[in-house]
């Protein structure tokens, strides 16, 4: 088995989490269980949880490192989603 450098594997996991976290957040948004203003916080929490779950994958870092990486990926995923959907202009319309 070829060993990768820790930093490269962490970037792979974070990239995956940046893509997956907004999918989970959108599913939660559709249920309307969480007000829109809390979705960025939910995204960070989901990223942290997914990061913790990724601890069990080969080549992952410590639990604390993976939770931190997941939380950063959740924050990044929210930022990317906001950028692509341009919600910043209509944010007030989404609040319930």
From Swiss-Prot:
GO annotations of cellular component type: host cell plasma membrane; membrane
UniProt xrefs under InterPro entries: Phage_A118_holin/antiholin
GO biological-process terms attached to the record: killing of cells of another organism
Subcellular location: Host cell inner membrane
Bilayer topology annotation: Multi-pass membrane protein
Annotated keywords: Cytolysis, Host cell inner membrane, Host cell lysis by virus, Host cell membrane, Host membrane, Membrane, Transmembrane, Transmembrane helix, Viral release from host cell
Residue ranges, Periplasmic side: 56-60
Source organism superkingdom: Viruses
Residue spans, topological domain Cytoplasmic: 1-32, 82-96
Domain remarks in the Swiss-Prot or TrEMBL record: Isoform Holin has 3 transmembrane regions whereas isoform Antiholin lacks the first transmembrane region.
Protein task: Isoform Antiholin: Counteracts the aggregation of the holin molecules and thus of pore formation.
Protein name per the record: Putative antiholin
Organism expressing this protein natively: Listeria phage A118 (Bacteriophage A118)
Gene: hol
């Amino acid at each position: 088995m070829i060993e990768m450098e820790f930093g490269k594997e962490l970037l792979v996991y974070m990239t995956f989490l940046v893509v997956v976290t907004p999918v989970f957040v959108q599913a939660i948004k559709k249920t309307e269980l969480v007000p829109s203003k809390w979705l960025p916080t939910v995204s960070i929490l989901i990223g942290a949880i997914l990061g913790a779950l990724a601890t069990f994958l080969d080549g992952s870092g410590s639990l604390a490192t993976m939770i931190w990486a997941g939380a950063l990926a959740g924050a990044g995923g929210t930022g990317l989603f906001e950028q692509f959907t341009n919600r910043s202009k209509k944010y007030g319309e989404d609040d319930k």
